Amino acid sequence: MPEVRALSAALRRGLDLWVRPEVRPESATSAIGAVQASPVCYVLERRSAVDLAALENLCIREGLPRPSGRILGRRQSAVHAAIPLLRARGIFDPRIDRRPPAELVRMIEVLERDSTIDVRLVPIAVYWGRAPQKEGSWWRLLFTENWALASGFRKLMQVLINGRFTMIEVGEPVSLRSLLLESGSPALQAARIARAQRAAFRRQRAARIGPDLSHRRTILHRVLSARAVRAAMAAEMRDKKLPRRRALMVAKGYLEEIAANYSHVFITFMEGFLGRLWNRLYDGVTFNHAETLRDVAQDREVVFVPCHRSHMDYLLLSYVIYKQGYAVPHIAAGINLNIPIVGRFLRKGGAFFIRRSFAGNALYTAVFMKYLAAIMARGHSIEYFVEGGRSRTGRLLQPKTGMISMTVRSHLRDPRRPVVFVPVYFGYERIVEAGTYVGELSGQPKRKESIGDLVRALRVLREKFGRVHVNVGEPIPLDEVLQQQGGDERRAELDEEGRAPWVSAVVDDLAQRIMRNINSAAAVTPINLLAVTLLAMPRQSMAESDLARQCELYLKLLRMAPYDARVTVTDLDGAAVIAYGESMKVLQRQTHKLGDLVRVSDEMAVLLTYYRNNVLHLFTLPSLIACAFISNSVVRTEDIQRLAWRVYPYVASELFLKWTEQELPGVMRRLLDALAELGILERLEEQDAWRRPAPSSPQSLQLSLLAQASVQTIERYYLAIATLMHAGSGALTARELSERCQLTAQRINMIYGFNSPEFSDRAMFDNFISLLLRRRVIRNDEAGRLVFDEVFLRVAADAEFVLSEQIRHSILQVTQVESIAQS
């Protein structure tokens, strides 16, 4: 009708003056252009004249087929080139009409009559007020995109207020003929295709604006009605002699303690607030490998598994995900953060709370498991920290597998969508908890969080914390891990809670992969380089020229022999790294006629161990090679390879290194070649050996400093070995050995003044002893005491090979003193 066309044209011209949509993905229009040989039909998520006009303007601007046209015929027999899926039944009837669009039925009828014709369906979703890179306002919050079908008035307000903050999501063109089955009427085929498209739009909308919260009470009711929860309630009633109502109230109390209270309005408000906060605290937030997120977000249940450095981790990851155009994930937060004011805000931001331990509380376990299963079933992305708590040392902690286990079991019970784990690495140049961490690194007990901590934290708003790097690691599809572990063939062994003996192996494997992939996405900042270099010096002081030269060496090594393609490295050169360290107040300069010296304070030296440990895994193998030359001027390749083979399993377990033992020889050869090219080793071809530089050369100093990155790790291993050897086979239990090693390490720390608190960390010794047992280097006798044989003595000999005589003598001397004190 001419009147309708005139109104549509007027609406389109009005929108063209005001609306500035962002198109996602950027390559979408070229993908549509590539399939114009077939008729194109745009499938809109919702019926809206405004949405259609916005799409029309986009197509005109990009030279694409227009949605206002017709396809598959002429005049009355033609089909509209745009069909909406969700539409109200009438002007005064807001209920959704779920019948398949008549145009879709007619298209299928045409395709069935003529086998030479095909139609390309292009899904289109328009989000008014969901362009994530723009800051929010209260008016925009009121009329931002949500899950309800908008009334005419609301749509008008959305256009007026959010017109410049609009996103058009264009799906991949798909052949309609490829979606048809051999049997079924056109109406049934259309209904099936429409259902699938609506489901895809729901998943896409959840990924973009967050979950549909209109059914939160339904989710909570479903959790409390679950058979496993009811069974746990019955056990609670029986064991504690509680009436049914009281047991129900206990379960409901647990659920209220756990559950998030996700708010779209709060999320949008926090985007603007956090944007201003980051600008005040940081010099920028860099999000690397964002394309990975785009690849996995659609049609998968995404589980973000970041490392845990700071309380800022919660906010930063949610912020960068939201800025990429995706919904904020539901975050598993420790119950210690459920404090007044803060806890309420975190719930509105998607946090659900988890106790440190479920032991002995079957009802709480059942409620939590069912809540996790419910939010996963609804397609919400989730996030949790597999380390359990924040790392105080800068190293990745050994993973806690509880949440991973519950995620795996939930998927095994109800595998609705593929699950993919997305590791995330946080690289801070300075952490806001620096003062607290220095105290804890120096031996002070960990403090419990309180509202007072929040007030004290406001003081940091006056300080600068450099740049933050958020790097996305290689995703890990759960189905891939299950297949490798033979899980697909063993699902019949699962009980109704998803438990089976083989599931533990899957969980452990998955946990280790996550930690390795986090480390494989590390960010190397100027502060990391300064920490690795200066902590190698006894007094944390160097000539400026030597410091710049060493930083340059590390930068070249990281680029010539990269640890992983996802590792990011600062673009600064050595001199600029020093200047940056001074601007961050990390370095102190001492002027001298023979050349300036650069140093750090004692307190800063303790904190720098944190930043060194963030990237220590990147330097471990090159440093291990350098260790071989501490007491040897020439070393054969086979001796270096044997040393690496002997030590690698222990450093790989401690630092979550990425390579298998089978890959190790090739990795060591590449590193040796890189070190030779950098001039700090000389290749002796005829002897198949390597020679260190002349002792008086700058390269000799560089090699010695590189060795220091891992020498304390080797010293710690040798300390444990020497302690056990001195005590004798069958003399100590694993616990007694660990305690004695810790005391000895503390004494060495006091005598030699190491600025390395983790050197005497009991957990490090526990992990090393446990790995010695698993690898059968030592064994437990019938009394539970440790016994060893020639294999252990060969490990000890290799440890001696890389340590200087002075270091070995010092360790043996302190070990003997400690042994006498214990006897």
Q: Which role does the model predict for each range below?
A:
Residues M1-S823:
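Membrane-interfacial terminal anchoring regions of lipid-handling membrane enzymes
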